[in-house]
Amino acid sequence: MSNIFKNNLLKILIILLTISSSGYALKKEDIKTQMENKIDKVLLVLKDKSLSKEEMKKEVITIVDDTFDFDLMAKIALGKDAWNGIDEAKQKEFSEVFEDKIKKSYSDKLELYNDQKVKILTLEPYNNTRLQLKTELIGKEGNYSINYNFYEKNGEWFIYDIDLVGVSIIQTYRQQFAGLLKEKSFDEMFKQFKNQ
């Protein structure tokens, strides 16, 4: 991965945690409006020069949670065979660590925010039973596509993956874990992941 791509990807990752709805998941008919509102709120936080870095991170994390299905994200990232090969307690621990890692990773990159804007494009059917919200990050260094993939559970829609300029966040983790699990046990791989 080139340095230019890495730098741009870091800026794009800032937006990942900005699209969650506080306290409830989304109804299909509300996805575009709610996502736009949440993005606007977080961008205001990122522009607030009176906040320290830690306050900014805390504010953004406060906005985040219930629209992402972090448990499903962890399960997909680990892979079906590896997930089914560990007991329920380890599944729960892995999900919690995975969620914390994602939140920390992206909140640590908030300082890279540089007046980018996000444009909501379309909400389209995706993989038959799913939806994809297409958005565009508009910045001084160029525009980048960010697509949010939703699935339905009990009449509400949750994010289970995000495609950044054509690269799936969850599939990237999955490839990383699969590579490690070829050489290590789950416990060894998990210990390494926790210590990263």
Residue ranges of predicted features:
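Low-complexity, intrinsically disordered terminal/linker segments enriched in charged
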Residues: 161-196
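Early exported N-terminus immediately downstream of N-terminal targeting peptides
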Residues: 28-109
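A mature extracytoplasmic/lumenal domain signature
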Residues: 98, 124, 137-139, 150-152, ...
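Bacterial N-terminal signal peptides that target proteins for export
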Residues: 2-12
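Surface-exposed, charged secondary-structure patches
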Residues: 104-144, 196
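Short beta-strand edge/turn micro-motifs at domain boundaries
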Residues: 145-171
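Boundary at the C-terminal end of the N-terminal hydrophobic targeting segment
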Residues: 23-27
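Bacterial N-terminal signal peptides
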Residues: 11-20
